[in-house]
Each structure stands twice: as C-alpha cells, then as structure tokens.
Swiss-Prot record:
A GO molecular-function annotation: ribose-5-phosphate isomerase activity
Protein name per its UniProtKB record: Ribose-5-phosphate isomerase A
Any one GO CC term of the record: cytosol
Function noted in UniProt: Catalyzes the reversible conversion of ribose-5-phosphate to ribulose 5-phosphate.
Amino acid sequence: MTQDEMKKAAGWAALKYVVPGTIVGVGTGSTVNHFIDALATMKDQINGAVSSSIASTERLKEFGINVYDLNDIDALSVYVDGADEINASRDMIKGGGAALTREKIVAAVADKFICIIDNTKTVDVLGQFPLPVEVIPMAREYVAREIRKLGGNPEWREGVVTDNGNIILDVKGMAIKDAKALEVQLNGIVGVVTNGLFAHRGADVVLIGTPDGVITQ
C-alpha cells in the first residue's frame, strides 16, 4: 500500500465520526482531501461544513457542499484534520500547509477532533518536522531573534503568505519534550499569531493508515 493509499484509508475511515444533520469541521492537506472526497458521498446527509482554508473551501464547493463562516454557527460536533507529526500523547505539529491559525480556531470550537494520518507521521518526540509559526510580517526578525533565544533555528518560508496575510517561520532544531509549555511560550512572543503545536487542543481520536489497514487510537 502506498503512502497516498494509507492517507485515503484514514480519510475514508473518518466518515463514521460524521454526525448526520450537522455541520462538519474540515481541515487542510493531502489526507484531508481524501476525507472531503469521502464526505461528498454523504453530502445530502449533512448541513454543510466549516473549512480551515481557502483551498479546502474550494474543494468542498466543487462537490456542492455548503461552506459556512465559523462566525455564523454556534457549535461543531466534529473537526477532521491531518498532522505533520503526532506523538503518543496526541500532541501534534501542524501547519505544513500554512493553515495552522484557522485550523487551531476550528479545532477549538469542535466537540471532537479526529486526526487522520498515515503511519509516517507518528513520532516519539516532536520536532523533526519544522515547527511552523505564523507571524505578523513587520515582526519577522524580532520573532526570529526571540525564537533563537529558545534554542530554535527559524527560517522564513519565503514566498508563502497565509490566508490571513501573514508569513511563516519554520523552526528547526528543537526536540520538543514539553509541547504544552512551548506552545504557550511561543504564543507569548509579541508578533506571533500562533504556532503549529496542537498540545492544549490535541486530537481526541487518531486514525492511522497503515499497510495492514486503519488503526484507531
């Protein structure tokens, strides 16, 4: 089974967590694209979706799924999204697709966060994948200096502008043993919008696509 086939298996497995008659929170990325494909098969059973990115919104609309503004709804029963890394505590690094801020907001609203991944995303210690930090453009160098004081090596992801009009610093060289503490520490730097650590709002269920099928954790 290829990596993409494992992603597809995880994406389709998430369908069983979708509650008919509700609005579904939808994340961003290659694995989520498979979930959107699956969600389209039951689009007449849901009331629509809230999306974490322009790209996912466009894909949902292509299937005729109504996309709501998060400000227009009171609650989400479920949010389905991928991860770049996840550990045994279900802490995650997300944001490889630069949608981390909107992903974190939608995840905060949802009653349940379903993380869909292939088996290459599970790690013992977070940090091999660069940690994305969304930053107000004028604060780029200041934030980079502050991150270096914490032991990280930030690199500007040149040419990338988030859906919110900000930039991304990818932080390398950090073995993240206390994800909750670092999440707060980074968010406390003036100019940081948010960072890609999802520790305070981690996953409730993890669906892992493997060569032998989907494992639920």
